[in-house]
């Protein structure tokens, strides 16, 4: 499948980014080189990397693809990003989702490489290598699915309205923010402050709906480049995003408008 995807991407004149951003145990590191060789073979343009061991192998063996530093739940510092750019050769970095705009807009003054910002989709807030769901099932003698398609949620005891998506795979347990992110109405501000690398996360937005949402953000980007992205245009495109978003999931602007003192 990845080989076919690479073919389609390159035929369309686009660049292929492949996620290699797991935190690697030694057994995974022992198997990483054949996978990196395959990515080189299919002419991957970028890989996302969250483990120092992968950076080491990529640089040691001289692979041609570029690297994007992606330990996104932990990346909140410009100096941290610059370190990976300088020492590991990262060409870009993925920012954490928990950075208020007041702090975010200070970062370009220090950043030496581009930073990617999530503008739509589920926001990961915690990752554990442990099989937390399976451990819970074992303790409670429950036999149930752990995958994303099971659509499981966590709720805080003090807040029954909370609903943190959770699933488990062979990389561990993944937990996501209460609501999904939608920064359609904030795109002009992001561009004005130098954030032009955007990510759309389609993990919980299946099929064609995600494709249509991506097209709306592409339309917004084109309007911004032409100087035609008005407040009304942003509102109209935002309404279209909300129509296409899964009905059982809510949207907000995440930490974007938070007071930085509330996050520390």
Predicted regions and their residues:
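Active-site pocket-lining/capping segments in soluble small-molecule metabolic enzymes
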Residues: 1-73, 94, 100-264
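Conserved nucleotide-cofactor-binding alpha/beta core module
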Residues: 77-79
């Amino acid at each position: 499948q990845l080989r076919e995807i690479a073919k389609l991407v390159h035929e369309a004149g686009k660049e292929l980014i492949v996620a290699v951003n797991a935190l690697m145990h030694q057994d995974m590191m022992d198997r990483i080189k054949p996978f990196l060789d395959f990515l080189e073979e299919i002419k991957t343009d970028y890989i996302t990397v969250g483990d120092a061991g992968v950076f080491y192998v990529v640089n040691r063996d001289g692979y041609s693809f570029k690297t994007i530093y992606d330990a996104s739940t932990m990346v909140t510092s410009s100096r941290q990003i610059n370190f990976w750019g300088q020492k590991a050769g990262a060409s870009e970095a993925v920012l954490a989702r928990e950075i208020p705009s007041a702090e975010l807009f200070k970062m370009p003054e220090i950043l030496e490489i581009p930073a990617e910002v999530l503008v739509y989709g589920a926001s990961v807030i915690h990752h554990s290598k442990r099989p937390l769901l399976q451990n819970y099932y074992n303790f409670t003698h429950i036999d149930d699915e752990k995958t994303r398609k099971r659509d499981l949620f966590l709720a805080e005891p003090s807040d029954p309205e909370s609903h943190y998506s959770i699933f488990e795979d062979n990389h561990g347990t993944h937990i996501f923010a209460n609501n999904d992110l939608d920064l359609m109405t904030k795109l002009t501000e992001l561009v004005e402050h130098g954030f032009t690398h955007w990510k759309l996360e389609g993990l919980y937005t299946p099929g064609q709906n995600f494709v249509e949402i991506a097209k709306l953000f592409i339309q917004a980007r084109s309007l911004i480049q032409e100087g035609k992205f008005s407040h009304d245009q942003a509102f109209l495109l935002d309404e279209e995003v909300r129509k296409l978003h899964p009905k059982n999931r809510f949207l907000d602007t995440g930490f974007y408008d938070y007071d930085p003192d509330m996050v520390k």
